[in-house]
Amino acid sequence: MAGQKQELPVSGEPLAVESPMTNKKKKKSKKNKHTEENHEVEEVPQEVTNGVEEELSNKEKKKKRKREEKESEKNKKKDVPEKKLEAEDLGEGESEQQKVVVTGKGVEEAKYAALKTFAESNLPENVLDCCKTFEKPSPIQSHTWPFLLDGRDLIGIAKTGSGKTLAFGIPAIMHVLKKNKKIGGGSKKVNPTCLVLSPTRELAVQISDVLREAGEPCGLKSICVYGGSSKGPQISAIRSGVDIVIGTPGRLRDLIESNVLRLSDVSFVVLDEADRMLDMGFEEPVRFILSNTNKVRQMVMFSATWPLDVHKLAQEFMDPNPIKVIIGSVDLAANHDVMQIIEVLDERARDQRLIALLEKYHKSQKNRVLVFALYKVEAERLERFLQQRGWKAVSIHGNKAQSERTRSLSLFKEGSCPLLVATDVAARGLDIPDVEVVINYTFPLTTEDYVHRIGRTGRAGKKGVAHTFFTPLNKGLAGELVNVLREAGQVVPADLLKFGTHVKKKESKLYGAHFKEIAADAPKATKITFDNSDDED
């Protein structure tokens, strides 16, 4: 903590420890006034002086001062509050410095200092074998490993492509090795020790690939279970004994209810893309699955946003004082490495405009271009339309069998068919390298989904382009989209401003000091599902 400035707590509020670089960045923060209102995670109470207070007599003022002094003295005697660390971090492949905020009890302890190198983790060589191609830990790995390796419950908020799979994967492997005493080899273990929940099949497979590669040098066995494929091989693999299970909520619940999968030994649980999981209507099966794990467990949640329903789930199943690590801004923000082009047009003009854009961006038919549709039937129609126009295209959506989806994704990744049409099933979490252009044929239902869609390009420090069609039907989201564009320093077209810049107020805060802002009597939202592409069999 050398060279850092410490500010004394105000009225019992958490201690803020800031680096000099953080102070520099704060001076620059005035340029986006429209985002300032929601930018602070924790508010410092301030004296509010109204007209009545100004007229207080000297006697009343003295009494008021004494009351404040007594209150201040009481706060000093209370337990030491949670700390908050703020620092600037430059991660692997990041084009600019990004803010890292770590909150929770004991975060200022030396043992929790962010890792600058993999060697500082003091992990066994076979555990770090999967990291040898990386120069240093990414920011999310650097800041979360010290806590996770110490057994702390943790909430991680970071954009996709930040290295979060290994952020929870390496600590999960170490947890299993210690639990099963397998560092030097060990006996066969039937029931799993670690469970990773994913909202989609594609993301589950991607996580499984990473954990299988990371766990093999340590002698660990993992299995990926999801709907849309035969249960037979999955059941056989589980019965033969596994250490780590990765799966989607529907199939996991099915296997638990049929007494094939027993989670009583699971003591390390990860919820990846937690916000997406609940948004897709999986809250009830997620609760059922978590209730079947060991009561003594370490819980990890990763999410791109932190809405109220995810807060409540965390409050119920996590330690009351989890560590919270936020990489980047807590506000909805797009990747600054992506050039965002918004084109306002009539719905009927989209087909011909799409062809014109492909002739511009995909003339070589070798670079990867990802086209987003909103509905499954729309994705099917676009795939046929493009093929009829002579473009080599494939698609992934819920109406396709899992084997077809896997094949389409493989063809796109390897470059055999570098034009992919997808619904939002591919928008979150998937690591598809070298996507040069994203085209939003239909604007998504939320600006959050828009940010995640365009995040498929501009990854690992590379530049990308996102071209979006915006029609009068989307005008209700114009204000939020304008804010996203301005935050990223992008051009806001005059045609978009014609729809207005009003942003509907959200009923609850997205972020706060863990769970303090949760309203116990908040009404449960009614979910409307438009694309059930990930309903489990």
UniProtKB/Swiss-Prot annotation:
Its EC number is 3.6.4.13. Pfam families: DEAD, Helicase_C. SUPFAM superfamilies: P-loop containing nucleoside triphosphate hydrolases (SSF52540). Residues 68-87 have a biased composition (Basic and acidic residues). Residues 145-324 form the Helicase ATP-binding domain. GO terms for cellular component: nucleolus. Residues 22-80 form a coiled coil. One of its GO terms (molecular function) is RNA binding. Residues 349-500 form the Helicase C-terminal domain. Keywords: ATP-binding, Coiled coil, Helicase, Hydrolase, Nucleotide-binding, Nucleus, Phosphoprotein, Ribosome biogenesis, RNA-binding, rRNA processing. A motif (Q motif) lies at residues 116-142. Residues 1-97 are annotated as: Disordered. The Q motif is unique to and characteristic of the DEAD box family of RNA helicases and controls ATP binding and hydrolysis. This is DEAD-box ATP-dependent RNA helicase 5. The lineage of its organism: Eukaryota, Viridiplantae, Streptophyta, Embryophyta, Tracheophyta.
